[in-house]
Amino acid sequence: MQERFKKIILLLTIIALYLGVYRLVQTINPVGINLEIGLDTYIPLIPEFAVIYLLYIPMIIFVFAFYWNDYKAYRSMSLMLIAVISIAIMIYSVFQTEVLRPIIASTDFFTRLTNTIYKYDMPNNTFPSLHVALTSTISAFVYEKNANFGMVLIPLTFLIILSTMFIKQHVFLDIIGGLMLAFVIFKNKKIFDIKEI
């Protein structure tokens, strides 16, 4: 099996899990518990962070493109992300959570963008945060492979993590859950160096 075909299969698996199974769990099991704690009440709503929140998509695409010609790195990273999404989906299936989002008047570009995110991204499947888990896993992976590139991604990842709270898509415990999931996956990264794939 050619490497190009394998890379496409890995990418399609990630897309299928995220756009298919993840969304299915959201629809089938839409109501969950609220994990908000006292700290969350002190975190302000900052609609401007909606732009940063959406940067995780081009970030992931760019990193995949960066490693497209390095099959070993591409394969390991893909398998790690598949594991992240799969574990998160299993958690959502048995422990559904939701965020109580504020009602925001669409008065400018940023509030309209935030409301658009609210419209298309349901307020459940929140613990652990996939935004946090995916971007953190990628940043750690890239930093180990290429420290200079990683040093660019780490600040962006930090801002993306903050954005999940500043636009009220996640609460603090969701962030902790996402970081823990990323840590477990990256700590066991050798598992994903499967030469047969």
Features from the language model and the residues they span:
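N-terminal transmembrane-helix/juxtamembrane module of multi-pass inner/ER membrane proteins
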Residues: 1-60, 97, 105, 114
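Membrane-helix interfacial "entry" motifs
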Residues: 3, 7, 42-46, 68-73, ...
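Alpha-helical transmembrane segments of integral membrane proteins
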Residues: 6-14, 75-83, 149-153, 173
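Hydrophobic faces of alpha-helical transmembrane segments in multi-pass integral membrane proteins
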Residues: 13, 17, 79, 83, ...
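Aromatic-anchored segments of alpha-helical transmembrane domains
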Residues: 18-24, 85-93, 155-168
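Membrane-interface loops
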Residues: 27-39, 68-148
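Hydrophobic alpha-helical transmembrane segments
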Residues: 50-63, 79-82, 86, 134
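Membrane-embedded catalytic cores of phosphoryl/pyrophosphoryl-handling enzymes
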Residues: 115-197
